[in-house]
Amino acid sequence: KNGKIKTRRDLEVEKRQLCRDLKLNKFMSNADILETATIEEKGSISGLLRKKPSRTLSGVAVVAVMCHPHECPHGRCFYCPKSDIAPPSYTGEEPAALRGRMYEYHPYIQTFNRIKQLYSIGHPVDKIELIIMGGTFPSTDLSYQTWFVSQCLKAMVDFGIVLKNIEKGMKLKDITKDIIKEDPLYSNNILKTFAPTDYVILEDVQKANEISKVRCVGMTFETRPDWCKKEHVDRMLNMGATRVEIGVQTIHDEIYKKMKRGHSVKDSIEANRVLRDSGLKVAMHLMPGLFQRQKEDLEMFKTVFTNDSYKPDMLKIYPCLVTKGSELYDLWKDGGYEPYTDEEAVELIVEIKKILPKWVRTMRIQRDIPSTLIEAGVKKSNLGELVYNRLDEEGINCKCIRCREIGHKDKNYDFEDFRLFEESYTAVEGEETFLSFEDNNEESLAGFLRSEERRVGKECRS
């Protein structure tokens, strides 16, 4: 209140002193302070107390939940880690998988507790982007898919009721399931639940979520290209999809055959077309190091962003890793395969970042697999940081959306510093327009809108 605490360092110094003065048994966490703060106080201090502020820099909180362990219909890819405790392509030790295991992969419990955790460390949770992870979700039982999504949305609606009670003066720890059930939404039977699992009808909970204090503003599904046909995409749309991530991995049929992928380049291109025709945002996973070296991999990425069959809105770069239990592990042990080293991966991804267009977002660099489970390949978990450091050393500004977001810039701007830019390009039988609000040097991005005109009519994706 006296304005003494202005930085995180000031806060830590004051917390240590207060713990000594009060002879507390444990060091107070920021979550402890937020729990005791009033609504008005939270408004002024949450920014200072917020842990990992970049998580909600855009104003949207990302909540990733994982579906139950299952088998991919085609079998297992050559490089895929073997695990009985997680869905395909995961080891069970990734952060999202650990949370999934903790809550026995129950969608409601995963979603509710992740929102609660984010709220407790000072993040806004009024807008949620839900990411449903776990191999090929559209290949699971149809009733399971509907139940899973409805339970995630129900968790958001219920946490919205929690926020209403907090506004009335209650503490988060005191709000029980019985108190949630007293809300008019349930007591007036607006949202019907069915015993014994609190089952809700998807359409009912979607409607309830539209007016909830915790709304789902984005929903992402992970899938393979051969499980991204029109019927699969229509089903995802009905569940609320706004983005689909497809595991493209490579653009060469001969590599698909080597890795026992079970689909073709044609499937990847068709999946991209169906998703765009449906007005969905498209993220592609690409895996450098799959029986290719740096020169060939760089050419692959150049093709992805110049060939109209690809040109994704978003990109995840996952260098190929060797894990025990995979067929790739046996090949590596026999000397028949050698993945990228840390330095080779950094060099390649730096070159990739140099050629990225301004309309793509780099979502992730490197898998979340713990280094202790990686037998060979990139073991440094901060690969992305190493790439960005190298770009800084070379004085290179990556043009992708992620690198130019204004929230990541240590600079103050005036509205007059920005103007509207327009860039048009073609992709999969459609005309794309990328409208962006940027500074005059095109180095800081304040906002953007994607618009596309396709053969099925006009769609707007933002």
Question: What is each of the regions a protein language model found here?
Answer:
Residues 1-110, 114-194:
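Flexible, acidic/Gly-rich N-terminal and inter-domain linker regions that tether
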Residues 33-60, 170-209, 213, 370, ...:
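Flexible inter-domain linker/hinge segments
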Residues 55-63, 67-83, 113, 289-307, ...:
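Gly/lys/ser-thr-rich phosphate-binding loops in alpha/beta enzymes
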Residues 64-66, 79, 131, 220, ...:
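Structured core elements
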Residues 70, 85, 249, 320, ...:
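Flexible loop residues that form catalytic
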Residues 93-110, 130, 134-154, 165-283, ...:
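Conserved non-cysteine loop/helix-boundary elements of the Radical SAM core domain that shape
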Residues 336-450:
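C-terminal accessory regions of radical SAM enzymes
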Residues 454-460:
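Conserved small/polar residues in nucleotide/adenosyl-binding loops
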